[in-house]
């Protein structure tokens, strides 16, 4: 980034207001600005900066659609085109897979009509493979061996019938989303490429920094801007992978990129792997033991607070974030966490799951009773214990007297337990139930000054994130977009919350950095510790 800042300043000068820097992620810009400021004693008009996904969104007339709504819209088209009686409950989770496939189609600029060609005319499909690369061609050929005329079954016939309609579903789905002004990511990207007018772009120069593997839509985008003389490219690599070893697999994509989009920096800037480095390998019996090694590592590398930002803790397994936060010693004054904290690792997530389980699988409508297992689980939760002084004695009493199927009236011993154990039916009532409980829990964190450590800040954020997520589902239910069974809602709530991360707030350019592997792109540090550098974690597959 320092090299990029120096080169840009030399080529463009101190007025970069008509320039935008595009990074694979947002983090690199904060460090870039620091380097750019050091290039001159005079004021500099800083360039705009954004991630590649943000740039596509700004160039699009459509908005990125809510993932849940996108599935609901696909379901409407699916029902109309196939005349299927399949419920949204059964469709939802494989509908997500279908959208993911459509996303891949668009990001790779595949001709959808050819891809979804009629399987009945198998010979024509096999003969027309120009749109596939060699690996894709072999995979498709192997797949279609199972669809010979002699070996067809009822299930295969059903699949062939569905495949026959996928092209129509794909086009109609895109048309419907366009009318609504929304899109899934691949559709949004593809529409930008197809409608791009380079003469009407906001910036004079688009500076692409530190990319590696490009999909077809990104490659096309780069090409369009390059042809319009509006693009500059900075690649971060090492000659070890491009020159010293012929056809090194790690250099495959960067070699391709360098050929298509030449680097603004000379090759001499990228010969660093041959320089001496001090590397230690440390074995540990468990992953948590690796986290507990952090204090010793910090003491050996950190002498002043000014050096904190020169150190990075990189988590190859991001599930280690919680033990790492607990292991950071007090002498580290500032910590910047560049990765979101998984909401699934917070108390509110387990509480919501327990509450949903209580109201769905834990309540027997026929008998009007709860099951002991679900009641016990929610009574043992820390939030329930904090909000009700009766929770612990009630749980002990149920266990002692073997009350396997308690009545709701036996559990309502105070205001909070009344709210908790009032049976709810229907998906709207369940959403109301969850938001009411979250509001009660939020009262525990009302006195912000009393809870100023990093974990309580996280838990407050997790409550807010959960509350807004449930409200989003409620809005879709109210408008009729989402109509599912209660057990599907339970799985959906769990899935959406599991996929959510809580952002950390703070000054990103100071303090010791804690990050995942992807967040390290474009960044350099004096000292790095890689945790969980194990097979199965780096890489996760291969």
Q: Where are the predicted features?
A:
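Nucleic acid-machinery interaction/catalytic patches
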Residues: 1-542
